Amino acid sequence: MKLRALVIAALVGMLAALTSVAAQPLTPHFPGWERYFTVSWEPFERRGQPYLRGYIVNSYGVTATRVQLLVDSLDSSGQIVAQRVEWLVGSNLPGFSTTYFEVPIRQQASRYRVSVFAFDFVESARIEPQAP
């Protein structure tokens, strides 16, 4: 009986911990992403559904892969009311290039904010011939 109560207490504690973690807003994985990318966007509707469309510019000379965008829906005071993470179509963004994106909005809001949530840069290894 004591073991059962202990297991239940442990499960409740784990659920409480997960709930408090889930309540934290998402933030970009790479602080300072703005040094490498510029994002512009505007809201629009397609068949009565809200979307954001815009462009992401890779101002760094290296291809970015697995690019994900973080879309924040904000209320009139700037507080986050909803968030979503979306993959950039194609997921690759060559260096010094611009790519168009569209993201469906889950919850309409007063304003939106789009940031680069995650990415990897492809750095190629250079193989030097060995001297004889």
Locations of regions flagged by a protein language model:
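Beta-strand signatures of extracellular beta-sandwich domains
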Residues: 68-72
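A short beta-turn/strand-edge loop motif at beta-sheet boundaries
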Residues: 61-66
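Bacterial N-terminal signal peptides
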Residues: 9-17
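Short, solvent-exposed, Trp/other aromatic-anchored flexible loops in extracytoplasmic proteins
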Residues: 82-112, 116-122
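Asparagine-centered strand-capping/turn motif at beta-strand->loop junctions
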Residues: 56-60
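Short aromatic-acidic-glycine turn motif
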Residues: 73-82
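Bacterial N-terminal signal peptides that target proteins for export
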Residues: 1-8
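Transition segment at domain starts
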Residues: 20-49, 123-132
